[in-house]
Swiss-Prot record:
Keywords associated with the record: Coiled coil
Claim: Coiled coil is one of the keywords in the record: yes
Recorded coiled-coil stretches: 217-299
Pfam families: FAM76
GO CC, alphabetical: nuclear speck; nucleoplasm
Stretches for region Disordered: 142-195, 287-307
The family this protein is said to belong to: Belongs to the FAM76 family.
Record's protein name: Protein FAM76A
InterPro entries, A to Z: FAM76
Source organism: Homo sapiens (Human)
Biased composition (Polar residues): 169-182
Length: 307
């Protein structure tokens, strides 16, 4: 009897082949609790419900610190404290200021001073490194699947040749040799056409390359789409910030304009009041001057008539 192994989620026992490699989950648990990326920190986690789109750590941080902001380095919406996410904060303390990622061109790649930590000699950020490793893993699985299928087909051909035997052996031998001779130039021409395109593949990889190349191209296109989405999100954030700044400047300008108008109105009112006061004072002085001149004239006329 074959050994049975427990699922890490439902704890029911299944054959080893029925469980997933990483999480050791059965088929039903894999469907009910898929591995998804957190909306905030972009790490993979086991989804408990369809409505839950963030991991447990981010859920706790949301309760403690509120909704996060985009990190000023990696642009991931995971900056709960300050303007940087926890990953970039720790990396900056450990490795110094960030450098430009050679894939997404963002200022979020940290140099660990170790060439073994680089990906094909390139300095990549955390997200681009994960994407590259996923592509390599999928390519490796695809090649393993292709090699196993070709090996199974070869074994079936050998079994068929053993069972056929007898008088058909010589005819099959001549047919097989002629078919092999006919197929060798085709494979050779195929390999030459691949190598002339500038690719340096070995013959074994050249025979298995079409499906693998298509898979790698699809994976690269997906990563490029993700990168473009990230850049688009970054541009949208920049546009929103600029629009916010323009709105603030407009509001400040309107406030200053209203203050200036109020000040001008107040100055005009004050000037009008001062002018009216001066005019009233001037009229009063003119009256006093007229009265003085009149009294002087009367005094002079009285002095003349008195002798």
């Amino acid at each position: 009897m074959a050994a049975l192994y427990a699922c890490t989620k439902c704890h029911q026992r299944f054959p080893f082949e029925a469980l997933s490699q990483g999480q050791q989950l059965c088929k039903e648990c894999r469907i009910a609790h898929p591995v998804v990326k957190c909306t905030y920190c972009r790490t993979e986690y086991q989804q408990e419900s369809k409505t839950n789109t963030i991991c447990k750590k981010c859920a706790q941080n949301v309760q403690l610190y509120g909704t996060p902001k985009p990190c000023q380095y990696c642009n991931i919406i995971a900056a709960f404290i300050g303007n940087k996410c926890q990953r970039c904060t720790n990396s900056e303390k450990k490795y110094g200021p960030p450098y430009s990622c050679e894939q997404c061109k963002q200022q979020c790649a940290f140099d660990r001073k170790d060439d073994r930590k680089k990906v094909d000699g390139k300095l990549l950020c955390w997200l681009c490194t994960l994407s590259y490793k996923r592509v390599l893993q999928k390519t490796k699985e695809q090649r393993k699947h292709l090699s196993s299928s070709s090996r199974a087909g070869h074994q079936e051909k050998e079994q068929y040749s053993r069972l056929s035997g007898g008088g058909h052996y010589n005819s099959q031998k001549t047919l097989s040799t002629s078919s092999i001779q006919n197929e060798i130039p085709k494979k050779k021409s195929k390999f030459e056409s691949i190598t002339t395109n500038g690719d340096s593949f070995s013959p074994d990889l050249a025979l298995d390359s079409p499906g693998t190349d298509h898979f790698v191209i699809i994976a690269q296109l997906k990563e490029e789409v993700a990168t473009l989405k990230k850049m688009l999100h970054q541009k949208d954030q920049m546009i929103l910030e600029k629009e916010k700044k323009i709105t603030e400047l407009k509001a400040d300008f309107q406030y200053q304009e209203s203050q200036m108008r109020a000040k001008m109105n107040q100055m005009e009112k004050t000037h009008k009041e001062v002018t009216e006061q001066l005019q009233a004072k001037n009229r009063e002085l003119l009256k006093q001057a007229a009265a003085l001149s009149k009294s002087k004239k009367s005094e002079k006329s009285g002095a003349i008539t008195s002798p």
